[in-house]
From Swiss-Prot:
Membrane topology of the entry: Multi-pass membrane protein
Assigned keywords, A-Z: Membrane, Transmembrane, Transmembrane helix
One GO term describing the cellular component: membrane
Record topological domains on the Cytoplasmic side: 1-11, 74-78
Transmembrane segments: 12-32, 53-73, 79-98
Protein's name according to its UniProt entry: Putative uncharacterized membrane protein YLR311C
Ranges in the topological domain labelled Extracellular: 33-52, 99-115
Broad class of where this protein is predominantly found: membrane
Length: 115
């Protein structure tokens, strides 16, 4: 926790540290996660193709599972995760914005407000 001091009306008020998160950093992190999923999906797809071609055994259900079911599961999962991160980020901004205003009004002079 980083605590900064602010001089206002002859009293010290503590302001909590706001992490440098915004839409672009969240999008970048999300794309990194998708790239990791893409690599794992390509690996699983190559393994399923190896089973399909090199062993001369027809596994249509396994092939369909690796080609369609797993990518669909990962895409839905990561879209929901991204929406959850965005929602919690905006809730954090609202909490920090209104919480700082309320704590400045309610804090007695000479005390730190630690959140």
């Amino acid at each position: 926790m980083k605590l900064t001091k602010e001089k206002k009306n002859d009293c010290l008020v503590g302001v909590s540290y706001i992490p440098p998160l915004n839409f672009f950093t969240l999008t970048f992190l999300f794309l990194l996660r998708i790239e990791k999923v893409h690599l794992s999906l390509s690996l699983s797809l190559s393994l399923s193709l190896r089973f399909y071609y090199f062993h001369n055994v027809c596994y249509p259900s396994l092939f369909l599972f690796f080609c369609f079911v797993i990518p669909f599961f990962y895409s839905v999962r990561f879209i929901l995760l991204y929406l959850h991160i965005l929602r919690s980020f905006y809730e954090l901004n609202i909490l920090l914005l209104y919480g700082a205003e309320n704590s400045r009004r309610q804090s007695p002079p000479g005390y730190y407000v630690i959140r």
